[in-house]
A protein has these predicted regions:
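Intrinsically disordered, low-complexity segments enriched in serine/threonine/proline/glycine
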Residues: 8-11, 20, 26
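Hydrophobic alpha-helical segments within soluble ligand-binding/sensing domains
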Residues: 154-157
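Nucleotide and nucleotide-moiety/phosphate-recognizing core
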Residues: 38-149, 159, 163-170, 179-185, ...
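Short, Lys/Arg-enriched N-terminal segments with co-localized hydrophobic residues
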Residues: 25-42
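Active-site-adjacent mobile loop/cap segments within catalytic or ligand-binding domains
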Residues: 188-202, 212
Length: 231
């Protein structure tokens, strides 16, 4: 038989609940600790850069969203809109570890606050638990580079995340440049849609290149900045 002895106290954000349990021989005290307002879990976050809305769904700027959609579909995961976090979230398992796929509901250049909210809520360490997937205008389409940390390199979405979390987190940069960029300004180009051929190649990239990189990240084996994949 157990009974609550009225002893609940707070230490910082951790509450301690003591329960007195009686058996036929002795009394014992069970102490339970739990976090207030946050959850501490062993998990990883895959955070995609992109813009919400159907009009942006197949655009170059939404490369990160497209990649996570493919990952979710491959594992039969379902997206859920979480207004608390201002994000669409799906859960998958990679190497037996829980991984949350995140598509922020803010626009591309304002994603940092959402990333910070998730990291704080789950008490994660960005340098170990956060991987951002985004398009990279400076790289040719079909090229993937891994970066372990660093400046935004002119990417406003990364600039926003850096402002809220610092620069020490991993990124997968997916090249989107092609010759059409030479006759378009940057804003129009990144918001232009992939061709049918490019969409097929992007699917192949996700399956054969990006997915193995994600597995490496989960295992703590993601290769450093010099790592480059060309297709």
């Amino acid at each position: 038989m157990c009974g609550y002895n009225g002893s609940i106290h707070s230490v910082s954000k951790v509450r301690v609940l003591q329960i007195v349990c009686k058996t036929s021989i002795y009394y014992s005290i069970i102490t339970i600790k739990f976090q207030c307002g946050t959850i501490e879990q062993d998990m990883k976050l895959l955070f995609a850069q992109g813009n919400p809305g159907r009009q942006y769904a197949r655009t170059r700027h939404n490369t990160g969203f497209i990649a996570l959609d493919a990952l979710a579909e491959a594992q039969g995961a379902t997206w859920s809109t979480q207004t608390k976090f201002r994000a669409d979230i799906a859960e998958i398992s990679v190497q037996g570890e829980k991984v949350l796929l995140i598509k922020p509901l803010s626009f591309y250049n304002e994603t940092g606050q959402i990333a910070r909210g998730l990291v704080d809520f789950y008490k994660l360490e960005p340098s170990e638990d956060l991987l951002v997937i985004h398009d990279e205008l400076a790289l040719p389409f079909g090229t993937i580079r891994v970066r372990q940390k660093g400046s935004d390199a002119g990417n406003n979405g990364i600039k926003s995340i850096n402002a809220h979390l610092g620069e020490n987190y991993a990124r997968i940069r997916v090249g989107i440049w092609n010759e059409r960029h030479d006759i378009m300004d940057d804003a129009d180009f990144v918001l232009s849609a992939f061709s049918e051929e490019e969409s097929k190649l992007l699917s192949t990239l996700v399956e054969t290149k990006i997915t193995p990189l994600i597995s490496a990240f989960v295992k703590g084996e993601l290769e450093p900045v010099s790592h480059k994949l060309d297709v």
